[in-house]
Amino acid sequence: WNPFKELERAGQRVRDAIISAGPAVATVGQAAAIARG
């Protein structure tokens, strides 16, 4: 068991999640800004 390998894999998973969630977060933020006027 290599903790660094595990960390690397976890980091990639987090990065993938951020990359896929990024556009959604931006859209929600934009919608909220528009709603606030």
UniProtKB/Swiss-Prot annotation:
Keywords: Amidation, Antibiotic, Antimicrobial, Immunity, Innate immunity, Secreted. It is found in: Secreted. InterPro entries: Cecropin. Signal peptide: none annotated. GO terms for cellular component: extracellular region. GO terms for biological process: antibacterial humoral response; defense response to Gram-positive bacterium; innate immune response. Belongs to the cecropin family. Cecropins have lytic and antibacterial activity against several Gram-positive and Gram-negative bacteria. This is Bactericidin B-3. It comes from Manduca sexta (Tobacco hawkmoth).
